[in-house]
Amino acid sequence: MKLRIKFRKYGPVRFIGHLDVMRFFQKANRRAELDVAYTGGFSPHQIMSFAAPLGVGLTSNGEYMDLEVHSLTSCEDVKQRLNAASVPGIEITSVKILPDKAGNAMASVAAAGYTVAFREGRDPHFDLSSAVDRFLAKDEILITKETKKGSREINLKEGI
């Protein structure tokens, strides 16, 4: 059965990269003594996947991880055991059982909201609100994307 785990990442843990967060959860799952499913083969790994990785230095109140387990007592028990095995800066906020045909966590993320905070005395020297309004009022926001096959222009306005 597959679980969708929602967690917070905050405080000093915000400076930990995505691969280290994955390793943390592998160890936390073992410490919490969860009945995690493993891949077959010569080098078995826990079957888990994350939604979009959070950039280094950013905090989040809504990160998602899918974890496959063989059995569980209850979602609340999994939440408590993982929180007990966790470190300050990572907190499990919810655990849900997913239907068998549910998509992965990444496919479930439709949008993200960001909040920008400035340190005291470090406010921008321009009106941020009007700058954002001018930016969003543009008909096109073109950037050049460089790939192995060459470069091409992309209109960011379609994704905003």
Tell where the protein language model's regions lie, with residue ranges.
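A generic structural motif
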Residues: 9-13, 71-73, 120-122
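Short, charge-patterned binding micro-sites
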Residues: 37-69, 99
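Internal, well-folded beta-alpha domain core
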Residues: 75-160
